[in-house]
Design a protein with these regions (language model features):
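Thiamine diphosphate
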Residues: 1-137
Length: 137
């Protein structure tokens, strides 16, 4: 399948496709509902899938990740969005020591996606422009 569009449009289409294909897929994050996300990657999801599957969260990356892990352990397929990847580090403990190790700790799968923009070049300064993945190599 070929796609002709922007990176954000491709992400949005992938989310729509996943949510259409599997009713267990849900999205959660800051301002992802009516606002459509910081970079508009979730525009239209709330209108199409409703507030039970498109969940606006408080400004707490730990709460977003913890909720996604819990939802995944209960059979959902959450896609958790960080407004900016800089703040993913605030929830790194949960992603590394709970989500990633659940298989070895409890024999459980955590089918969750944690995503967000990095190094977008939007002039966001030291707390909204970092490419966190570079730090993990």
């Amino acid at each position: 399948m070929s796609f002709s569009g922007t990176y954000v449009e491709a992400i949005r289409q992938a989310l729509f496709d996943a949510m259409e294909a599997d009713p267990r897929v849900c999205c959660l994050g800051e301002d992802i509902g009516a606002y459509g996300g910081a970079f508009r990657a979730t525009t239209g999801l709330l209108e199409r899938f409703g507030p039970d599957r498109v969940i606006d969260t408080p400004i707490s990356e730990q709460a977003i990740v913890g909720s996604a892990i819990g939802a995944a352990l209960m059979g959902q397929r959450p896609v958790a969005e960080f407004q900016f990847m800089d703040f993913a580090l605030l929830a790194a403990d949960l992603m590394v020591n709970f989500a990633a190790k659940a298989h070895w700790r409890w024999g459980a799968a955590v089918p969750a996606v944690f995503r967000g923009p990095a190094g977008a070049g939007n002039g966001g300064g030291p707390f909204h422009s970092r490419a966190v993945g570079v730090s993990s190599h």
